[in-house]
Swiss-Prot record:
This is Hemoglobin subunit alpha-A. The keyword Iron applies. Keywords: Heme, Iron, Metal-binding, Oxygen transport, Transport. Belongs to the globin family. It comes from Drymarchon melanurus erebennus (Texas indigo snake). Residues 1-141 form the Globin domain.
Length: 141
């Protein structure tokens, strides 16, 4: 459960991310595909080279979807409902990939922070991204 302090920290940390969605998204996906090559399975039709237009476009979609969750921290499930259905029922993405994506996104945020993230910010981001992952797998049966 996100506290009001968590929500405040997430919103503050997310500002630069949402303003640079394509950059953060593409970099996060590059980290994901590099660290966890099995995640490439769902993107066989993409050019997965760093900086490709496919990574930029899909990365922006990912960040925009998470931004919607940030903008609705009191109803993350509602904000991500359609996306959860899509990934569970149509795309059938392995649920563990959402957790891996969250970790890669945290690293990307930290890399662009200009210095170490404060422990309480890391904790709040981690709680939020775990909530996002949990929400996205909620439609799996």
């Amino acid at each position: 459960v996100l506290t009001e302090e968590d929500k405040s920290r997430v919103r503050a940390a997310w500002g630069p991310v949402s303003k640079n969605a394509e950059l953060y998204g593409a970099e996060t996906l590059t980290r994901l595909f590099t660290a966890y090559p099995a995640t490439k399975t769902y993107f066989h039709h993409f050019d997965l080279s760093p900086g490709s237009s496919n990574l930029k476009t899909h990365g922006k979609k990912v960040i925009d979807a998470i931004t919607e969750a940030v903008n609705n921290l009191d109803d993350v499930a509602g904000a991500l409902s359609k996306l959860s259905d899509l990934h569970a029922q149509k795309l059938r993405v392995d649920p563990v990939n959402f957790k891996l994506l969250g970790h890669c996104l945290e690293v990307t945020i930290a890399a662009h922070n200009g210095g170490p993230l404060k422990p309480e910010v890391i904790l709040s981001l981690d709680k939020f991204l775990c909530l996002v992952a949990k929400t996205l797998v909620s439609r799996y049966r």
